[in-house]
């Protein structure tokens, strides 16, 4: 209802500000941290539409898949922010206390999101995630450097390595995300197919059909 419309309006407003932000970046009139925060805010408003949509879903399989996808996308977004913040610190050759805390927050925030996804996702998507999407040893080593000490000056070599490793992980996460989207669409199409006879009968029968119990899931 009105809450969903408000979420959509906020997201549209944030999207409308992207050209001005890109122009500032092109003219180097905005700090990297501020630009990253603005991009993250746009994505956050887009993602926040999902909980409002979920409030209108009465079918448990569809609701579960929606929450699994939403949780996964939240985790994936935090991985993207981790990539950006780490690349910034390694490029500069130092991590300020503020930048380091932001990085730690993004790393710590990923696990609850992915735990929620694994509790609700299909066995196939969960297995794919566990097989290829965890941060590998190379990423963990660079995380320790970023979070505990200052990196050595190497002309940006570590920054490129960090960015490449995180990009590879994001591509693997995208593969799982696409499967989650397919799962949600399949469940939705199945629900529509099952409900079609009921819609036709409803034109001749004014009785109220019992509604499915809604599973309340934290987002």
Specify the residue positions occupied by each region the protein language model found:
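Hydrophobic alpha-helical segments
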Residues: 1-219
């Amino acid at each position: 209802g009105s809450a969903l419309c408000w979420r959509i309006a906020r997201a549209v407003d944030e999207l409308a500000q992207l050209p001005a932000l890109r122009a500032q970046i092109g003219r180097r009139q905005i700090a990297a941290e501020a630009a990253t925060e603005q991009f993250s805010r746009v994505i956050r408003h887009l993602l926040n539409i999902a909980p409002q949509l979920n409030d209108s879903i009465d079918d448990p399989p569809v609701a579960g898949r929606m929450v699994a996808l939403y949780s996964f996308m939240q985790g994936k977004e935090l991985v993207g922010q981790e990539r950006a913040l780490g690349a910034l610190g390694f490029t500069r050759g130092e991590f300020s206390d503020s930048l380091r805390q932001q990085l730690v927050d993004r790393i710590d925030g990923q696990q609850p999101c992915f735990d929620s996804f694994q509790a609700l996702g299909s066995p196939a998507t969960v297995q794919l995630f566990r097989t290829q999407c965890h941060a590998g040893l190379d990423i963990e080593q660079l995380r320790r450097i970023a979070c505990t000490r200052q990196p050595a000056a190497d002309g940006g070599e570590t920054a490129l390595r960090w960015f490449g490793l995180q990009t590879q992980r994001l591509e693997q996460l995208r593969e799982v995300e696409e499967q989650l989207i397919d799962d949600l669409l399949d469940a939705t199409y199945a629900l529509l197919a099952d409900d079609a006879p009921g819609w036709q009968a409803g034109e001749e029968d004014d009785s109220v059909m019992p509604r499915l119990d809604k599973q309340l899931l934290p987002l």
